[in-house]
Amino acid sequence: MKKIVFLFFLVLLGGYVLLLAKPELYFDKSVDYGIFTLRARGELPASPEGVLNSAGDRISGSDIYTPGQRFELILTSGPWEYRLFTPFLKGGFFRVNPYNAAVFLAPGADFAGDKAVTASGYLRSLSGVVTAAAAWVMTLRKVMPLTYLTMGDWELRGYAELLSGGTGEFNPADACAGGDRPGLEDYRDGLLLDRLLKEENLVYNDLLLRGASKEDAERRFRRNYCGG
């Protein structure tokens, strides 16, 4: 009996791992638009053009974008689906599978209204979220997998913020004051990265090649924005 239970468990585990590696087996509806492939288990959005055109324009302006790159966006229909396909990953608006670079969008992605929402109710433009997710994907494709898994999240968040244009709701004084307001950490990391790139006369790809120190970026940020 124990062997049967164990074998059953192995079958379930194997099926789960297969779905993580090939989510298209579950999210069986898809449509291609520009540089994107949208996948869903249920109904696909009727008019994704506005969001995807806006995101595509920003993505194509990245110094680590190469023609021919495509981005797979998977629309989850509920919190359980979002968690099931992104174990051990974090992200309120999106999560990127490091194995296959698939982007899982949080439930509630509204293409018609260009709105994305976290479980806590924090809103952002969906086009900005898609752009930010693409920044993570392009970084993943640019560096070695182990480098991606061990590099500082501040670099990923910072570049995603710069490429997406942010939300426009914060200023440097907010970043200096700190706090736990939704979106503030992304904005602050964007300032850190922006300051470092400008002072060193670098583009993001240069930084990926040579590496970056958060302590150094923090010093530059405080000197320029916080008075010391």
Predicted regions mapped to residue ranges:
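Zinc-dependent metallopeptidase catalytic helix centered on the HExxH motif
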Residues: 96-172
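Auxiliary, metal-adjacent structural segments of Zn-dependent hydrolase domains
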Residues: 11, 50-112, 119-123
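Soluble non-cytosolic domains of exported or imported proteins
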Residues: 42-53, 120-125, 129, 150-154, ...
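N-terminal low-structure segments adjacent to metalloprotease catalytic domains
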Residues: 1-36, 41-53
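Sec-exported extracytoplasmic/periplasmic mature domains
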Residues: 60-64, 135-144, 161-169, 194-202, ...
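Surface-exposed patches in mature extracellular/periplasmic domains of secreted proteins
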Residues: 60-74, 145-151, 173-176, 203-209
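Solvent-exposed, polar/charged alpha-helical surfaces in well-ordered, non-transmembrane soluble domains
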Residues: 53, 57, 128, 132, ...
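Pan-zinc metallopeptidase signature
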Residues: 6-7, 15-21, 183-228
